[in-house]
Regions:
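Short, flexible/disordered intra-domain loops and linkers
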Residues: 63-75
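C-terminal catalytic histidine-bearing segment of alpha/beta-hydrolase fold enzymes
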Residues: 55-60, 74-121
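Active-site nucleophile loop of the alpha/beta-hydrolase fold
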Residues: 27-35, 59-62
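Hydrolases whose catalytic domains are alpha/beta-hydrolase-1, hotdog thioesterase
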Residues: 12-16, 37
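Flexible "cap/lid" loop of the alpha/beta hydrolase fold
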Residues: 32-50
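Conserved hydrolase catalytic core segment
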Residues: 15-25
Length: 121
């Protein structure tokens, strides 16, 4: 079974690493890691679920048209990617050149391809 999501769903999925050890695979596509205090939370806590595979994908131009904390979305995402890579056994981390709402089908296709390879389907 895999659990994950896009945007806030991706944030929620990654948050679950810190509260449950039930999922063998968690994914986040364009996770909203800019959410206030999320990076600090990840730094201050260790995942409960260290044995699951984690798939992370964010865009390098997410938040580019904003002037608030969303403008730094790629920076927050990079911090979370690095933290999760250090804290979890198996983490795939990728950044693409797109904005938050761009090329969603391509992003889900990339995840599907990775999942097929991971689970040898």
């Amino acid at each position: 079974m895999a659990y994950g999501g896009y945007s806030l769903g991706g944030l929620a999925a990654i948050s679950s690493l810190y509260s449950s050890d039930k999922m063998p695979l968690i994914f986040s596509i364009c996770g909203s890691f800019w959410y206030p205090n999320f990076v600090a939370y990840c730094k201050a806590h260790q995942p409960i679920n260290k044995s699951c595979s984690v798939y992370l994908r964010n865009g390098l131009t997410e938040g580019a048209k904003h002037k608030n904390r969303l403008a730094k979305a790629p920076s927050y995402a990079k911090e979370v990617h690095e933290l999760i890579k250090k804290q979890s056994v198996s983490t795939y981390s990728a950044f693409d050149p797109y904005g938050h709402h761009d090329h969603l089908q391509e992003r889900y296709d990339a995840f599907s391809d990775w999942l097929i390879e991971q689970w040898k389907l």
